[in-house]
Design a protein with these regions (language model features):
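N-terminal secretory signal peptides
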Residues: 1-13, 24-27, 38-40
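C-terminal segment of N-terminal export signals and the immediately downstream linker at the start
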Residues: 32-76
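A short C-terminal boundary segment appended to hydrolase-like catalytic domains
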Residues: 47-54, 408, 433, 440-467
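N-terminal active-site segment of His-dependent metallophosphoesterases
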Residues: 66-71, 78-83, 90-96, 105-113, ...
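Extended active-site neighborhood of metal-dependent phosphoesterases/phosphodiesterases
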Residues: 75, 141-170, 224-338, 364-374, ...
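Aromatic sugar-binding surface patches on proteins
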Residues: 119-128
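Short, flexible loop/turn segments at beta-strand junctions in immunoglobulin-like
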Residues: 131-135
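Active-site glycine-centered loops adjacent to acidic/histidine catalytic or metal-binding residues
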Residues: 187, 214-215, 251-252, 348, ...
């Protein structure tokens, strides 16, 4: 006879068996004493098939890891009389130097590392080198040397690949002895077809200085976009920038995008030594000589008020324009600028309304969405008294995507030329003959400044005039 304890154990055993059996039957869709069980999941899950964990993407800062390094064509930037910036694209982690000399044989050549003092920077997308101590109006030959890091797990295990020596190019520094012409393009907006038309023209005509007068970009959300636009554009004539010194003038679109504040990583600003300590932050303004011409760069900034909700409290352009006025006042009194026979100022947004504007030629309107608003008027009010006193004869602008030439008028003794944009005879899907990409050239002939507007879409001269 079983003890009470044994009877309880048997009951517990039978109860557990019933539960487990019922669960198994339910899993198999069988009928139990409690009736047919349907759609009941078993508490005992079937083993899941083994799935290998996803591999993390390779960290580009760990090295190229056997992938061949692609090296782009160099781009001359921030041209000056005694310095030159050189930037080029790379497809992976690399270091770079520039070798240069005042002769094509590279006799007594100089090698310059990227960066300044201390540790030379390395990068996965762009290398930047600044040549300093150059002679004004002098021709130099140069080439890039780029070396990939095949592995960079840490400083003790880093490995270098074979150096890649670039093609030899040449450039001439700015200065009074450089008798080259200037060329201006604007509002390219990353539109490659019209950009190629301008690049091809520049490559064939070889100006002494290119002014890229704003709106090179649209909205820049990452570094790759900036590298493509400034260093590695997908056009046949991209190598024009390797031998034509360029100075960049910011447009309103060149301030848009979550990444754009880091543009210095792709586009070299002016050297700190080229501006006094009072204007340390004015890294895009410049005043240089190109023969008998003084070339001055000003930044009109964004095309909306600082308080506009689209800026989310980030805009600080109104104080920026005032600071530039103080800089301009000093720049135009520098002996090499003041003594220039012709003084040309470049800015993106026009400082004066179009002739068909209802307020032309007085520009008294404060806000005009059709042509320009008070931000441009603000620049005019701040800068024009200085420009008039200094004898500025020509302002070259963009922004409007339509070529025009404004003659001098009372209170404004300078001509204003506005370059065309990227449109090819169309505007918002409709034919518009006034929309065409331009290259604006300026050259001194027989003691006169000759300005020519080239329509590179129809391969014609839109206008030529003399000052």
């Amino acid at each position: 006879m079983r003890s009470a304890h044994e009877v309880l154990d048997m009951k517990e055993f039978n109860r557990r068996g019933f539960i487990l059996g019922g669960a198994a039957a339910a899993a198999a869709g069988c009928t139990t004493a409690g009736g047919k069980v349907e759609n009941v999941s078993s508490p005992v899950q079937a083993a899941k098939p083994f799935v290998e964990p996803k591999q993390k993407p390779l960290d580009p800062y760990k090295g190229t890891r056997g992938v061949p390094l692609k090296v782009g064509t160099p781009c001359l930037q921030s041209a000056a009389s005694t310095s030159m910036g050189i930037s080029w694209s790379v497809s992976g982690l690399a270091k770079g130097v520039v070798e240069y000399a005042d002769n094509p044989q590279f006799l007594n050549s100089v090698t310059v590392k990227s960066g300044g003092f201390g540790l030379a920077p390395i990068d996965i997308s762009a290398i930047q080198v600044r040549l300093t101590g150059l002679k004004p109006a002098t021709r130099y030959w140069y080439r890039t040397v780029t070396t990939p890091f095949t592995d960079y797990s840490n400083i003790y295990n880093a490995k270098l690949g074979e150096p890649i020596v670039g093609k030899t190019y040449s450039f001439s520094t700015l200065g009074e002895g450089n008798r080259g012409k200037f060329a201006m393009i604007c509002d390219t907006h990353g539109q490659w077809k019209s950009y190629e038309m301008r690049a091809k023209f520049l490559k064939e005509n070889k100006p002494g200085l290119l002014l890229w007068n704003g709106d090179a970009t649209n909205t820049t959300q990452d570094k790759a976009t900036a590298v493509e636009i400034f260093l590695d554009p997908p056009i046949p004539s991209a190598d024009f920038a390797a031998e034509i010194p360029m100075s960049f003038v910011s447009g309103n679109h060149d301030y848009r995008g979550s990444w754009i504040s880091k543009i210095n990583e792709v586009l070299l600003p002016r050297l700190p030594s080229e501006r006094s300590s009072d204007f340390w932050d004015l890294k895009w303004n410049f005043a240089e000589r190109l023969g008998d011409m003084a070339i001055i760069g000003m930044d009109t900034g964004e095309d909306k008020p600082d308080a506009h909700p689209k800026w989310f409290g980030l805009a600080n352009f109104e104080p920026y324009r005032k600071a530039q006025a103080k800089w301009l006042e000093q720049a135009v009194t520098r002996p090499e600028i003041a003594s220039a026979k012709f003084k040309v100022l470049f800015c993106h947004i026009p400082l004066y309304a179009a002739p068909d504007h209802p307020d032309y030629p007085h520009d008294g309107v404060k806000v005009d969405p059709q042509d320009y608003a008070y931000w441009s008027r603000e620049c005019f009010d701040l800068w024009n008294p200085i420009m008039e006193k200094a004898g500025i004869q020509l302002v070259v602008a963009g922004h409007k995507h339509r070529y025009r030439h404004d003659l001098p008028s009372p209170g404004r003794r300078w001509h204003q030329v506005v370059g065309g944009g990227h449109e090819l005879g169309m505007s918002r899907g409709k034919p518009d003959a006034g929309r065409f990409p331009t290259v604006i050239e300026g050259v001194i002939k027989d003691g006169r400044l000759v300005v020519t507007a080239h329509d590179v879409f129809k391969n014609r001269i839109a206008e030529t005039f003399m000052i």
